[in-house]
Amino acid sequence: MTLDLQTTIEKAWESRANLSPADASAEVREAVEHTIDALDQGRLRVADKSSGEWIVHQWIKKAVLLSFRLQDNEVMGEAPLTFYDKVQTKFADFGAAAFKAGGYRVVPPAVARRGSFIGRNVVLMPSYVNIGAYVDEGTMVDTWATVGSCAQIGKNVHLSGGVGIGGVLEPLQANPTIIEDNCFIGARSEVVEGVVVEENSVLAMGVFLSQSTKIFDRATGTITYGRVPSGSVVVPGSLPSADGSHSLACAVIVKRVDAQTRAKTSINDLLRA
């Protein structure tokens, strides 16, 4: 079934400029709808980890993009929160039974789009989760945090207030941004452009990470890009230019996570009861 979906999506992608709500074939509509529904239920995800490496399923991302070509804008929601969009909100038709079955908490006015997956014991404070995103169990998405399109958030992650996790749809990115299990992302930090923050890492308040951000390891003196090693404690910093005339922002790995760090950033099970 998945192979058939992929074949249909890939073929439709080649002629995407000609797709519209009026003339798309039933086969393409069904393939895209089935893929979005599978993303919504967590049966499919844009990226998953296999043998220690993240594998990105580009065809699923293409299905998400194609879905925007196949839908007209429509009025949704109720006053005073009325919207006009192509993508329905995830909880539009939910009643008490559906929320209990999902096992998560959604604090008004949090919004998750249909096609995003929310795991059990997740808490969505007034925040935003975009289509294609995967938020695994036990994670806290704090107030005004945003989880971008197709971003992958692991188990027991804390996204602090105002955190931005970048999406892939605009500007178009090859790979999703990934925050692995048991990470703590400090307030107002931004992780974008497919950067991977490996498990058990802590980002301090105001850390900005893109593919071009230098990640300086204080212990080794090495500079890397695009990936924070497992168990790192990262703070914002700067590195001087070769001629000493100026400095540019960077992220600094100051140490590895220890018991003291973990005590300061541990999740509160009382909030997930």
Curated annotation (Swiss-Prot):
Entry's EC annotation: 2.3.1.117
CDD domains: LbH_THP_succinylT (cd03350)
GO cellular component labels: cytoplasm
Ranges in a coiled coil: none
Binding-site positions, substrate: 105, 142
Keyword terms of this UniProt record: Acyltransferase, Amino-acid biosynthesis, Cytoplasm, Diaminopimelate biosynthesis, Lysine biosynthesis, Repeat, Transferase
Subcellular location(s) of the protein: Cytoplasm
Disulfide topology: none
Keyword Membrane tagged: no
GO terms classed as biological process: diaminopimelate biosynthetic process; lysine biosynthetic process via diaminopimelate
One Pfam family matching this protein: THDPS_N_2
Main localisation: cytoplasm
Domain of life from the UniProt record: Bacteria
Subunit structure: Homotrimer.
NCBIfam families associated with the record: dapD (TIGR00965), PRK11830.1 (NF008808)
Record protein name field: 2,3,4,5-tetrahydropyridine-2,6-dicarboxylate N-succinyltransferase
Species this chain originates from: Bordetella avium (strain 197N)
